[in-house]
Amino acid sequence: MAALVLSLLLLSLAGHSSASWCVCKTGLSDTVLQATLDYACGNGADCNPTKPKQSCFNPDNVRSHCNYAVNSFFQKKGQSPGSCNFDGTATPTNSDPSYTGCAFPTSASGSSGSTTVTPGTTNPKGSPTTTTLPGSGTNSPYSGNPTNGVFGGNSTGGTTGTGINPDYTTDSSAFALKNSSKLFICLLLIASSGFCSFLML
């Protein structure tokens, strides 16, 4: 029985640990985050959920919209190396950034409303498209003209950190709960392995 429980715990941990997301780095100005947001939304990210009256619009601040956009871009690129860089403004994470009412996708199929843009044509924003991954060469969030939040960013420099902490500046109760459940599972594994060795005596 203990072996069955241990096997199920290991399987659930293995399945959970494979997920990866992309979020904007903390400590960056709203202007930098807006440029990153605009780049991601203009190059294939599904930013529709960050539009008004959509599931990820609130909290309405640049950081939370940037997080959703870079993650969508990262998933659309198949979590490929370099697709979560954005010239150093984003970073991959294994901690799910989803929050109440806003689920961040973990795969390209998890993003809805995608559009295919043919390289060399114009995208819905009207600027030339590129096939270069963000953070490499001269194609970065800082080349081109930002659209001041057309795809959901708040370019007014509003307060970040509102709502239930989607900007990740401090640990929220959801992260604390997630981390405490990992600790509980680790303790359970240690206790069960000690229990199993005691039974073998």
UniProtKB/Swiss-Prot annotation:
InterPro entries: X8, X8_dom_prot. One of its GO terms (molecular function) is polysaccharide binding. Disulfide bonds join 22-84. Residues 1-19 form the signal peptide. A lipid is attached at residue 172 (GPI-anchor amidated serine). Residues 173-201 form a propeptide. Residues 150-161 have a biased composition (Gly residues). PANTHER family: BETA-1,3 GLUCANASE, PLASMODESMATA CALLOSE-BINDING PROTEIN 1. This is PLASMODESMATA CALLOSE-BINDING PROTEIN 1.
